[in-house]
């Protein structure tokens, strides 16, 4: 496995870093890992390495580079405050420019998919609806304003039933507007996949990973080449 940092450029000329993890053998495809509000921190790099261990090239773009680089925050109140401030400064459209640029590079390894967590879970939704990339969204708490958008690519969603950030009426609206979308619920809180957070739930995380890799095995094999518009 090769783990390193690379520099990429978005369509508007913005340069940004990305953490890259490559498997020892020819990749099965590529997966873009989209951060939480805490930046491309140790956990997000670990996620990229887990994906690489399953045979995919993994790229984690540092989308916060647009609003001040080298952002790597802890899972505490101070980290949440700084992360939310960066999210407010950045918005979704600029982050999608960086993700699209990452996808254009990542497709050198084959079909491209996306996985995102929390804020990145909402970006994963937008990757499916706007970029046409197969996507896995973990507990995307900011997705509600975009529920009228129609996915252009396969989409899988994971939520914790004890997630205080995502109310039941969100789930009801999601089911009403997208009744055929595969959505899984777990007996866990927000951030249940992250073993550095208080809400980490090992059994739920393991089951979600199995479903996630089954999704990528199926849909990256079927995915068309990514076209950057």
Protein language model regions, located:
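N-terminal cap/leader regions of alpha/beta-hydrolase-fold enzymes
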Residues: 1-229
């Amino acid at each position: 496995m090769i783990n390193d940092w690379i520099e990429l450029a978005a369509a508007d000329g913005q340069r940004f870093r990305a953490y890259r993890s490559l498997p020892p053998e020819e990749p099965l495809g590529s997966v873009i890992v989209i951060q939480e509000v805490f930046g491309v921190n140790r956990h997000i790099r670990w996620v990229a390495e887990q994906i690489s261990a399953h045979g995919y090239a993994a790229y984690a773009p540092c989308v916060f580079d647009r609003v001040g680089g080298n952002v790597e925050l802890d899972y505490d109140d101070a980290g949440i405050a700084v992360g939310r401030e960066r999210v407010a400064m950045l918005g979704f459209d600029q982050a999608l420019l960086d993700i699209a640029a990452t996808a254009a590079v990542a497709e050198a390894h084959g079909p491209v998919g996306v996985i995102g967590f929390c804020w990145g879970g909402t970006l994963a939704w937008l990757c499916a609806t706007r970029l046409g990339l197969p996507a896995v969204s973990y507990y995307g708490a900011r997705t509600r304003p975009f529920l009228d958008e129609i996915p252009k690519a396969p989409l899988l969603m994971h939520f914790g039933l004890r997630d205080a950030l995502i109310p039941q009426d969100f789930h009801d609206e999601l089911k009403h507007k997208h009744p055929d979308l595969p959505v899984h619920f777990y007996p866990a809180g927000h951030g249940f996949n992250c073993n550095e957070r208080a809400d980490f739930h090992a059994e739920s995380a393991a089951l979600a990973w199995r479903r996630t890799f089954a999704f990528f095995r199926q849909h990256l094999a079927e995915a068309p080449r990514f076209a950057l518009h």
